[in-house]
């Protein structure tokens, strides 16, 4: 049987006490057996109680003693339990909401044998509509199980006439329960009215066997078809709940074939568990729209978004690139470090008391904790006293990682499990190396620094990327300042006279730059890998993106190097930027390699300098930063004079006047979580040659379907020819409007060095 997502929750925060206490004397059933039953049945039970206020009926001393109902959640209840409040005439009652296996474990620990819920769920903290109808078939004195089943089939027939499905249960007490899922939720009052009419209709059709009246004196020899439990204020024993009877019976889902069996009887908890492998959840369609637990369910249950600055997203996490990590210094009750690795839309998290080991000679404890949201990659702040994890948290390091092995058992904290293993190579500013996390037992893992594998091959290097920001507050003591050159980013691998040039995406582009052949001779005594920019210069010697787009043979194109990644068999990725810069300048001294001068002064002076020189902007680099291939790092900050944005072409409009035979404007978008977002049109900045070239390139990409995630505004949709979103360009613009459009965009050119999936808002 496939496991339901609810079954993946952990329960290490619930400690079972008095496991040997006998709760069912007639069978000797202990509290430990009850606890194990609820843990085992949670995968199918939780969807039918999720989102609903839970009333518990407790037998702390067993079913031979008195029981009591408990609605109000005690102040001592754990903070991670989800809550919901209902205001009654007598006041407000706060109920537990059991959305997880762990929550059901808490119910069992309290000896709450019976779980009762209404037929509605909370919605945004308030009482929502009924999602299902329930009929309780309560037998009067002398009524047999066969007669109950006869009435159940009659109810089913009436529901079928209404195009509604009906699901039967033996209640575990005396009667039967029938559940009817509602395709469209209705008010509890509406559900009660419908159920009452069905009951009254059967009472009229079968007056000797059915009554819809609550008066007990009228029930002898009849089945009371109880419709009243659909009232918003009433509850019903939950499917799969134990019953507080002499024997540990269960409100057990049954098949309709069983309801026709004259030998039908109530089932014990062990029998219900045995049936799971054969039948699965017979009620699965009943609550198919239940709020599905995801990997952040436990995380959310431990935090109140109104009380903590931590991110508490409501959305189900979406899978990302599985390549980011963060280490946070957490000044909680005890100082420790939290390692978080992006995986399948969440951050798999470990508390590491002494941080990751620095050498291969030592191992350190790492305690697995609940998955955290992706937003936690950037979280820092103070968690208030009284909240989970209270204390100050700062980002100690962050970066990217590569995976060799990532095995985290589904039952992460099973005390008998020791099969988890993670091997990753971390690329951060402080941590850079190969690490293993090995599960020793349950939630305890071991963190080990491994020997690094052979250095990455030069042909595998990807460019390090800068983060958008302002350099105004940066000082020259900590930061170096370079010009941001208006060209194409390239990686050059010069190996003793052999030259290879790759674009930012790794595409081989050696043939596109015949002007760089001389570098092979200039660097013939070395094997060197350089990072830099291919630039086309205008008449005044300033890099021009327009010239780069439309370069002719006579266009002056140069390679401007600004970093060195490899030299004669040695990787320089871990060297400080200051040391790499010295090596680069020494390599260029007296040769043909161009290394542009750094900019003078602090951040403001550097920006003023590039304004006067008409450069694109400034890139600030920390003197002590390492080179982090393929990662957008906060160690490099780019600050542009002009607003520029990479865009994806999603269509074009016919021109007018002199452009009537070609393109008048391009229709632009930026990829996002929901698809390609329309950001406007651009109709200026083109040369006639560019427009002709664009038309030829877009013609084979024609499509009848819009590539955008929403219909275009009417004024923009008129006369549009849609194309497949495969070409990337760049525009300059004045500002971004509140609805996500680019104001006054001007075309700068195509970006053949970029792919659509690389385009994001800058």
Curated annotation (Swiss-Prot):
Keywords: ATP-binding, DNA damage, DNA recombination, DNA repair, DNA-binding, DNA-directed DNA polymerase, Exonuclease, Host-virus interaction, Hydrolase, Ligase, Manganese, Metal-binding, Multifunctional enzyme, Nuclease, Nucleotide-binding, Nucleotidyltransferase, Transferase. It catalyses: ATP + (deoxyribonucleotide)n-3'-hydroxyl + 5'-phospho-(deoxyribonucleotide)m = (deoxyribonucleotide)n+m + AMP + diphosphate. The active site is at residue 484. Disruption phenotype: Not essential for growth in the absence of DNA damage. 320-fold reduction in NHEJ on blunt-ended DSB, with a loss of nucleotide insertions. 100-fold less efficient repair of 5'-overhang DSBs with little nucleotide insertion. Upon deletion, the fidelity of DNA repair depends on the form of the DSB; for blunt-ends fidelity is very low, for 5'-overhangs remains 50% faithful, for 3'-overhangs repair is fully faithful. NHEJ on blunt-ended plasmid is 24-fold further decreased in a triple ligC1-ligC2-ligD deletion. Residues 296-453 are annotated as: 3'-phosphoesterase domain (PE). Residues 14-260 are annotated as: DNA repair polymerase domain (Pol). Mn(2+) 4 binds at residues 486, 616. Residues 463-760 are annotated as: Ligase domain (Lig). Residues 18-21, 31, 58-60, 68-72, 76, 88-93, 109, 233-234 bind DNA. The record marks 372 as: Transition state stabilizer. Substrate binds at residues 57, 116, 136-138, 171-177, 229, 235, 243. Mn(2+) 2 binds at residues 136, 138, 226. Changing residue 336 to A: No effect on efficiency or fidelity on NHEJ of blunt, 5'-overhangs or 3'-overhangs. Mn(2+) 1 binds at residues 136, 138. Binds 4 Mn(2+); 2 Mn(2+) for polymerase/primase activity, 1 each for 3-phosphoesterase and ligase. Disulfide bonds: none annotated. One of its GO terms (biological process) is double-strand break repair via nonhomologous end joining. Its EC number is 6.5.1.1. In the N-terminal section; belongs to the LigD polymerase family. NCBIfam families: LigD_PE_dom, ligD_pol, NHEJ_ligase_lig, PRK09632.1. The N-terminal divalent cation-dependent polymerase/primase domain (Pol) functions as an independent domain. Deletion of the Pol domain (residues 1-288) yields a protein severely impaired in NHEJ on blunt or 5'-overhangs. LigD has variable architecture; domain order can be permutated, domains can be independently encoded, while some bacteria lack the 3'-phosphoesterase domain entirely. With Ku forms a non-homologous end joining (NHEJ) repair enzyme which repairs blunt-end and 5'-overhang DNA double strand breaks (DSB) with about 50% fidelity, and DSB with non-complementary 3' ends. Plays a partial role in NHEJ during 3'-overhang repair. NHEJ repairs DSB with blunt ends and 5' overhangs with a high level of nucleotide insertion/deletion, without a need for microhomology. Acts as a DNA ligase on singly nicked dsDNA, as a DNA-directed DNA polymerase on 5' overhangs, and adds non-templated nucleotides to 3' overhangs (terminal transferase). The preference of the polymerase domain for rNTPs over dNTPs may be advantageous in dormant cells, where the dNTP pool may be limiting. This is Multifunctional non-homologous end joining protein LigD. It comes from Mycolicibacterium smegmatis (strain ATCC 700084 / mc(2)155) (Mycobacterium smegmatis). The lineage of its organism: Bacteria, Bacillati, Actinomycetota, Actinomycetes, Mycobacteriales.
């Amino acid at each position: 049987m496939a496991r339901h997502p609810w079954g993946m929750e952990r329960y290490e925060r619930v400690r079972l006490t008095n496991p040997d206490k006998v709760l069912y004397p007639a069978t000797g059933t202990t509290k430990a057996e009850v606890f194990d039953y609820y843990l085992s049945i949670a995968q199918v039970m939780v969807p039918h109680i999720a989102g609903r206020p839970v009333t518990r009926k407790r037998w702390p001393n067993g079913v031979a003693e008195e029981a009591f109902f408990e609605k109000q959640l005690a102040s001592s209840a754990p903070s991670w339990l989800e809550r919901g409040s209902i205001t009654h005439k007598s006041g407000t009652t706060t109920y537990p909401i059991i959305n997880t296996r762990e929550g059901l474990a808490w119910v069992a620990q309290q000896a709450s044998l019976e779980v009762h819920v209404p037929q509605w769920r909370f919605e945004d903290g308030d009482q929502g509509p009924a999602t299902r109808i329930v009929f309780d078939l309560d037998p009067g004195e002398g009524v047999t199980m066969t007669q109950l089943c006869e009435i159940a089939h009659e109810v089913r027939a009436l529901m079928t006439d209404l195009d509604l499905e009906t699901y039967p249960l033996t209640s575990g007490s005396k009667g039967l329960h029938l559940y009817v899922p509602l395709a469209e939720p209705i008010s509890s009052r509406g559900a009660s009215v419908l159920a009452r009419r069905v009951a009254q209709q059967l009472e009229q059709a079968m007056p000797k066997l059915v009554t819809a009246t609550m008066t007990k004196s009228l029930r002898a020899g009849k089945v009371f078809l109880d419709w009243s439990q659909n009232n918003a204020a009433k509850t019903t024993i939950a499917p799969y709940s134990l019953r507080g009877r002499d024997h540990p019976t269960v409100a057990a889902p049954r098949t309709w074939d069983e309801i026709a069996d004259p030998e039908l009887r109530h089932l014990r908890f062990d029998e219900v568990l045995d049936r799971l492998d054969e039948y699965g959840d017979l009620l699965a369609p009943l609550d198919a729209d239940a709020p599905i637990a995801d990997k952040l369910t436990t995380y959310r249950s431990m935090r109140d978004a109104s009380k903590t600055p931590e991110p508490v997203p409501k959305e189900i996490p979406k899978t990302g690139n599985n390549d980011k990590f963060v280490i946070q210094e957490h000044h909680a009750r005890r100082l420790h470090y939290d390692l978080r690795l992006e995986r399948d839309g969440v951050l798999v998290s470990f508390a590491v008391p002494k941080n990751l080991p620095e050498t291969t000679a030592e191992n350190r404890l790492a305690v697995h904790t609940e998955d955290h949201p992706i937003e936690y990659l950037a979280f820092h702040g103070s968690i208030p006293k009284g909240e989970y994890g209270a204390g100050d948290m700062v980002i100690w390091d962050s970066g990217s990682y590569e995976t060799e092995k990532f095995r985290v058992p589904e039952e992460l904290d099973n005390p008998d499990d020791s099969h988890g293993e993670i091997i990753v190579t971390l690329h951060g500013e402080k941590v850079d190396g190969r690490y293993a996390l090995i599960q020793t037992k349950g939630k305890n893992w071991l963190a080990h620094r491994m020997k690094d594998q052979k250095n990455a091959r030069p042909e595998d290097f990807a460019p390090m990327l800068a983060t958008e920001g302002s350099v105004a507050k940066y000082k020259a003591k900590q930061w170096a300042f370079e010009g941001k050159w208006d060209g194409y980013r390239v990686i050059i691998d010069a190996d003793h006279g052999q030259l290879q040039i790759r674009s930012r995406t790794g595409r081989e582009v050696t043939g596109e730059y015949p002007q760089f052949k001389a570098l092979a001779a200039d660097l013939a005594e070395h094997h060197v890998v350089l990072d830099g920019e291919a630039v086309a210069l205008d008449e005044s010697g300033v890099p021009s993106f327009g010239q780069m787009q439309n370069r002719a043979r006579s266009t002056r194109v140069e390679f401007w190097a600004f970093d060195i990644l490899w030299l004669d068999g040695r990787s320089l990725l871990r060297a400080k930027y200051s040391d790499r810069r010295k090596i680069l300048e020494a390599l260029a001294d007296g040769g043909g390699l161009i290394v542009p001068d750094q900019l003078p002064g602090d951040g403001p002076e550097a920006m003023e300098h590039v304004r006067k020189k008409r450069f694109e902007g400034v890139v600030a680099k920390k003197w002590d930063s390492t080179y982090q291939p393929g990662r957008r790092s906060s160690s490099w900050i780019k600050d542009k004079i002009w607003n520029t944005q990479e865009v994806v072409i999603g269509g074009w409009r016919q021109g007018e006047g002199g452009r009537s035979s070609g393109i008048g404007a391009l229709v632009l978008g930026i990829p996002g979580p929901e698809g390609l977002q329309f950001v406007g049109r651009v109709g200026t900045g083109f040369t006639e040659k560019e427009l002709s070239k664009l038309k030829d390139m877009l013609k084979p990409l024609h499509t009848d379907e819009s590539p955008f995630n929403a219909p275009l505004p009417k004024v923009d949709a008129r006369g549009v020819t849609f194309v497949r979103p495969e070409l990337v360009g760049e525009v300059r613009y004045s500002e971004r409007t509140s609805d996500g459009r680019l104001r006054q965009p001007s075309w700068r050119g195509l970006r053949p060095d970029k792919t659509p999936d690389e385009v994001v808002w800058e």
